[in-house]
Amino acid sequence: MCNSKKRLALFASGRGSNGEALYKAMQEGYINGEFVVIITDHGTAGIVERSKSWNIPLIVIQRSDYDSKASFEQAQLDALEPYKVDGIVLAGYMRIVGAPLIERYEHRILNIHPALLPSFPGLHGHQQAIDGGVKITGCTVHFVDAGMDTGPIIMQNTVPVLPDDTEDTLSDRLLPIEHKTYKEALRLFCEDKLTIKGRVVYIED
């Protein structure tokens, strides 16, 4: 187990509910890590107010402020550099992470997706599950690679899909499971208990 706290960056585009669950788990000592900076691509996102209450530096990096994808991605790298982060946590970050960030932080970027990958990647995972007629769906915490929700899977948990489910009801049922799963996966990451071999993530007992 690593004794020193992992220095983590939180990337979020929305209200930051998963980020809040992780932050609380850190404050309670369950996760041996700390958010040292928050990056958002929306200056009016709910995570902005959360960052103030947490007293964590927030940096707004919006794609529209940059002439090119390359300059936008370089701005992300430049923003992170002073904080010397050990890992990046994506929590409702709605942009595809570019190659420069993935290469710089290989196997150190975590994401949560509201479906049982490799099924139903991309947007609207809840609705995809309903439309697909599956009886069970869930969430997946995975390392980020260059594909769309294709990185090595760390952990998954499930919920039933009910006959009368809507995207909203299924999302509400899954959200607390997302919080639980992400907290456990990040705890393992911060304790250096995850090893990647090919496509498989092994968890140290």
Model-derived segments and their meaning:
Residues 59-64, 112:
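Short beta->alpha connector loops at strand-helix junctions that form conserved
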Residues 34-37, 57-59, 108:
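Conserved beta-strand segments of alpha/beta enzyme cores
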Residues 20-24, 49, 74-81, 183:
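Amphipathic, non-transmembrane alpha-helical secondary structure
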Residues 54-55, 105:
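Short, structured coil segments at secondary-structure junctions
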Residues 2-46, 50:
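N-terminal Rossmann-like dinucleotide-binding module
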Residues 20, 196-205:
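Short, basic/aromatic-enriched C-terminal tail that caps enzymatic domains
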Residues 25, 41, 87-200:
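Donor/substrate-binding cores of folate-linked one-carbon enzymes
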Residues 60, 67-85:
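Glycine/small-residue-rich loop that forms an oxyanion/phosphate-binding "nest" at active or ligand-binding sites
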